[in-house]
């Protein structure tokens, strides 16, 4: 096919026309017939050539138009498919971002709820620490005799240390939760920014897809979507997807870390609560047992004091009897001594160891011996009365200390808000509420209290029998002396 503006022989038509113009227009001269004929032939050749050139141009234009239409249609189809694929991919990433963002928001709410529960738990622990401190302070006011490192004191010290340690762990857990929330908030900000960009990208791509094939549309929508002055360099598709995947992967990492933290906190709180309730239950049992033991010991001391006072009364009665008997013997002794002294005044001739002399001497000796024995008994009874008085004073002092200790121990028990000792401690301070699961343990404790009561009763009976035996022995010893 000849090129445009050239003949089939390769002659350039522009140059040919320029040369043809030079051969025409010779005004005022004759031309040869040959030139005249040649001019027409050349012009006819030129016309034919122009016709061929025009036909060639029309064919080339038709082919170009067809190729251009096909190319444009294909390009538009490719762009539409690319936009549709991009919209689908962006929508998928947007959905994943929305799901992950919802999980992050939910996890932040769970962490804040965990923090609130920890703070409430720490408040209860601080209240228990206050009650425990008050108990230790009140218990320090017991009399010196009652200051013993008993199970109650050990339990209070153990509970104070345990509660302080748990309070420290709660504070550290709250700080860790705050750090975790800060990390999740940063993740949330990244996800929200990425989600906003994805939403805007969807809006832009949907607008691009909706632009019609119209010459008048150019310049109408682009100004409303034009980026700001701080343009950013374009990313590769791989980098674009990887950035979002990195955000999602980072979010899932912190979500898993937060879930592990909440699980660990829940496990630690459950264990500490179980340990705390167990220690509080044992402390409550020890306090009640201490009150019961102090009360029983005070009752035993009071019973013994009554026995000592009864023995004091009997000893004083015995002393009165001995004193009366001694007084009764002093008259006959004085009489016998006086008789013997008067009889010694007989003349020497009459100084005979006769029956009267022997009887008087024997009477004086018997009365002196009896008086001596009675005096010894009176002195012994006086010493015993003094010992009984001292014992009674010690018992009274001990009972007074036991009364003070009992009042202090009862006050210590009631510091948790109970009205009386029979009431169970509040569950927020001491132990769990009564349940069917604690029934076997309650029955066991009741059985232990019954056995302790039986043991106390048996001890009292034994002490009463020992006291009766001592009294019988004392009575037998006194009768033998007379």
UniProtKB/Swiss-Prot annotation:
Modified residues (Asymmetric dimethylarginine): 462
Chain positions covered by the region annotation Disordered: 311-330
Keyword Coiled coil among record annotations: yes
UniProt protein name: Tektin
Keyword Coiled coil: yes
Similarity comment: Belongs to the tektin family.
Main location: cytoplasm
UniProt GO BP: cilium movement involved in cell motility
Classification via InterPro entries: Tektin-like, Tektins
Record PTM: Asymmetrically dimethylated at Arg-462 during flagellum resorption. Probably methylated by PRMT1.
GO cellular component: cytoplasm; cytoskeleton; motile cilium
Keyword terms: Cell projection, Cilium, Coiled coil, Cytoplasm, Cytoskeleton, Flagellum, Methylation
């Amino acid at each position: 096919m000849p090129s445009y503006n050239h003949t089939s022989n390769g002659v350039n038509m522009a140059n040919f026309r320029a040369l043809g113009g030079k051969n025409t227009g010779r005004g005022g001269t004759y031309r040869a017939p040959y030139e005249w004929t040649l001019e027409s032939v050349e012009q006819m050749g030129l016309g034919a050539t122009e016709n061929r050139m025009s036909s060639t141009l029309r064919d080339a234009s038709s082919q170009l138009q067809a190729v251009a239409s096909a190319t444009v249609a294909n390009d538009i189809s490719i762009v539409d498919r690319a936009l549709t694929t991009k919209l689908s991919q962006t929508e998928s990433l947007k959905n994943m971002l929305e799901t992950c963002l919802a999980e992050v928001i939910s996890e932040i709410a769970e962490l804040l709820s965990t923090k609130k529960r920890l703070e409430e738990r720490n408040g209860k622990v601080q209240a228990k620490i206050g009650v425990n401190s008050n108990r230790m302070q009140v218990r320090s006011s017991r009399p010196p005799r009652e200051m013993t490192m008993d199970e109650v004191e050990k339990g209070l010290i153990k509970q104070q240390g345990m509660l302080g340690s748990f309070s420290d762990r709660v504070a550290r857990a709250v700080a860790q939760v705050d750090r975790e929330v800060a990390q999740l908030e940063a993740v949330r900000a990244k996800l929200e920014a990425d989600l906003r960009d994805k939403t805007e990208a969807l809006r832009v791509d949907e607008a691009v897809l909706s632009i019609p094939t119209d010459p008048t549309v150019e310049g109408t929508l682009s100004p409303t979507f034009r980026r700001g002055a701080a343009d950013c360099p374009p990313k590769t598709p791989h980098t674009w997807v990887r950035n979002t995947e990195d955000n999602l992967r980072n979010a899932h990492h912190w979500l898993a870390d937060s879930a592990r933290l909440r699980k660990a906190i829940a496990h630690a709180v459950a264990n500490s609560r179980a340990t705390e309730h167990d220690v509080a239950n044992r402390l409550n049992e020890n306090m009640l047992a201490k009150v019961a033991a102090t009360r029983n010991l005070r009752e035993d001391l009071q019973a013994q004091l009554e026995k000592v006072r009864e023995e004091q009364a009997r000893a004083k009665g015995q002393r009165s009897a001995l004193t009366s008997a001694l007084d009764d013997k002093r008259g006959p002794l004085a009489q016998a001594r006086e008789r013997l002294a008067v009889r010694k005044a007989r003349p020497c001739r009459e100084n005979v160891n006769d029956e009267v002399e022997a009887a008087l001497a024997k009477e004086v000796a018997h009365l002196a011996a009896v008086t001596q024995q009675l005096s010894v008994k009176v002195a012994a009874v006086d010493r015993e009365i003094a010992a009984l008085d001292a014992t009674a004073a010690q018992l009274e002092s001990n009972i007074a200390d036991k009364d003070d200790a009992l009042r202090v121990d009862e006050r210590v028990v009631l510091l948790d808000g109970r009205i009386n000792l029979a009431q169970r401690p509040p569950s927020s301070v001491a132990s769990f509420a009564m349940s069917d699961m604690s029934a076997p343990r309650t029955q066991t404790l009741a059985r232990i209290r019954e056995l302790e009561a039986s043991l106390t009763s048996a001890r009292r009976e034994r002490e009463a029998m020992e006291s009766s035996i001592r009294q019988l022995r004392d009575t037998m010893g006194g009768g033998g002396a007379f």
